[in-house]
């Protein structure tokens, strides 16, 4: 059975590229912002890993992390943040609040895949 990957990004092109790249290996779900993603999760949908953008409308990446962290259902789901910000302070903020990894746009999909696999390996231990 395929692992389910949730992509949360307000740039439709990012969602399409990642869905295309990962669909052979993962069951990919794409949502446009943190609010939409949280609503989908709260409907009872299960996810194995989340890749979310930092800068999004309605609910930004940091607020999305905070929402995940207050829930016993979601706080242990591996979470990788994407961002166009290559600032140490932003990376530290995301990691400090519960993100497991952080990658800067533009990124190499192969590197993203390796990071996702590494996060998923850790939850098997």
Where are these regions (language model features)?
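Receiver (REC) domain active-site loop signature in two-component systems and cognate sites
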Residues: 56, 94
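The feature encodes the CheY-like receiver
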Residues: 15, 57, 87, 105-106
């Amino acid at each position: 059975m395929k692992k389910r990957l949730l992509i949360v990004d307000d740039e439709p092109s990012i969602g399409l590229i990642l869905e295309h790249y990962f669909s052979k290996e993962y069951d990919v779900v794409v949502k446009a912002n943190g609010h939409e993603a949280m609503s989908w999760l709260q409907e009872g949908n299960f996810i194995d890993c989340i890749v979310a953008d930092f800068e999004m409308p309605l609910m930004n990446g940091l607020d999305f992390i905070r929402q995940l962290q207050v829930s016993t259902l979601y706080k242990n789901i591996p979470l990788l943040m994407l961002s166009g910000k290559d600032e140490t302070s932003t990376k530290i903020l995301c990691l400090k609040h519960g993100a497991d990894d952080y990658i800067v746009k533009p990124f190499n999909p192969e590197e993203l895949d390796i990071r996702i696999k590494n996060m998923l390996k850790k939850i098997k231990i």
